[in-house]
Amino acid sequence: MNHSRSHALFAQAQTLLPGGVNSPVRAFKSVGGEPFFVARADGPYLFDVDDNRYIDYVGSWGPMIAGHNHPAVREAVEQSIRNGLSFGAPCAAEVAMAQTITRLVPSCEMVRMVNSGTEATLSAVRLARGATGRNRIIKFEGCYHGHGDSFLVKAGSGMLTLGVPTSPGVPAGLSELTATLSFNDFEGATALFDEIGAEVAAVIIEPVVGNANCIPPQAGYLQHLRTLCTRHGALLIFDEVMTGFRVALGGAQAHYGVTPDLTTFGKIIGGGMPVGAYGGRRDLMEQVAPAGPIYQAGTLSGNPVAMAAGLAMLELVQEPGFHTRLSEATSMLCEGLEDAARAAGIAVTTNQVGGMFGLFFTDDIVESYAQATACDITTFNRFFHAMLQQGVYLAPSAYEAGFMSSAHDEAVIDATLAAAREAFAEVAR
C-alpha cells in the first residue's frame, strides 16, 4: 500500500499536535509504525488520504454500530443543522433523547446530557460523593473511565494499598482516594470492602472490560459487587460508554441482569458526534443542579445536532433482531479468527459479548488484566500490520476491544477471514 500522503500529514501533525494526534492510541505507539489519515468512511469501510480501503473493526472506538455514514443518521444531522448548530438553551431533541434512554434502560429514571464519556464518569463520581458524603472510590485494573484525575490511578504493591498515579500531574492526595481491584476477583472485592467499606462512595466499573482488550465478567461477579455496595452503603456505577446499546439493547446491565445505581453513556448515543450522559435513580439525579446542590454544567450539553444523530442511531438499534444478528456476525468473525490462527500454528483465543470482541495471542481464556498483559504482544503487533497491509483495520493496540457493526455482512467477514489466513501465515513464517 502507498501511504505517502498519510506520511506527509503525520510529519506535519507532529509539529502542531502533541505526538501528531488528538488521542494517544491513534499514534500507533503501541504497535509501531505510523497511522494512516482517514479521508472518508462508509458502511464497514474506511478510506485513507492515499485512497486505500480498510475493513474497519474500530468503528470510531464503538459508536458506529450501524456502520459509518449511515443514511438515516446523516439525514437526521443534515435536517438538524438547517435549524442551527447550537442554541445554549433547551431543545426538544434533549427531551426525546432522555425519553429514549430512560425507556430502554429502566435503571435510569432521569438522565443528564454531557459532551463526552469522560464528563459523564467525572460527573457520576461527583454525584456519588455528594450523595453519600464519602470520598473514596473503587475502580478496576484494565477499566478505563476517561482521563479524569481520579481514574488515572493504578494499584499499589498490595491490594489494599493506596492508589498510585499513572500520569504526572495527578496529585498524590487525590489518587489516594481511589482504590484499585483486579477485575473478576471475588475475594479481593470482599476484603477491600471489609477494610474500607464505610468510606466508599462508589464502585465504578466497565461491566465488560474494554481497555484490556475485551474481558467479560465471570458468572455472578457483577451481582457480587451489587451485593457489596448495597451492604456497605456505596453506589454502584456502571460505565456503559462502550457497552451501552451495544452488547444488548439495554446494555450490559440488561445482558447480565444486574441493576446499578448510576450509569454512564457515550459513543452510540451520539451516533458519531461528541456526546455523553449519566443517569440513574431519581432520588440521586434530583441532587444534580439546578434541582439540587451537586453542580454540573456544560455549554454544549444537549447539542441539537448531536441529539439528532444519537436519536437516529438509537432508532436503528431498536430494529427487531438487530443485536441477535450483530452477535452472530461477531461470533462468526471470532470463530473464523481462531480457526485461521490454529491452522497457522499460532496460539489465539477470543472473547465476545454481543458486538464487542477481543483477540488474545495466548492459549488461555483471558479473564483478568494480568492475563491480558501476559499475552504475546510482539506477535499481535506483527499480525496487526499484516492485516493492515491486507486492508483490515484492527484496534492499534493489544489492549483495546474490537467492534462489529451491522454493515459487516457475511461477505465482509469472509474477506476479513481470508486476509487473516494470509496474515497468520505471514506471522508464522
Curated annotation (Swiss-Prot):
Catalytic activity line of the entry: (S)-4-amino-5-oxopentanoate = 5-aminolevulinate
Family statement: Belongs to the class-III pyridoxal-phosphate-dependent aminotransferase family. HemL subfamily.
Pathway(s): Porphyrin-containing compound metabolism; protoporphyrin-IX biosynthesis; 5-aminolevulinate from L-glutamyl-tRNA(Glu): step 2/2
Enzyme class: isomerase
PROSITE patterns for the chain: AA_TRANSFER_CLASS_3 (PS00600)
One Gene Ontology term, aspect cellular component: cytoplasm
Official protein name in the record: Glutamate-1-semialdehyde 2,1-aminomutase
GO molecular function terms listed in the Swiss-Prot or TrEMBL record: glutamate-1-semialdehyde 2,1-aminomutase activity; pyridoxal phosphate binding; transaminase activity
Keyword Isomerase: yes
Organism: Xanthomonas axonopodis pv. citri (strain 306)
Gene3D superfamilies the UniProt entry points to: Aspartate Aminotransferase, domain 1, Type I PLP-dependent aspartate aminotransferase-like (Major domain)
Names of required cofactors: pyridoxal 5'-phosphate
Gene behind the chain: hemL
SUPFAM superfamilies, sorted: PLP-dependent transferases (SSF53383)
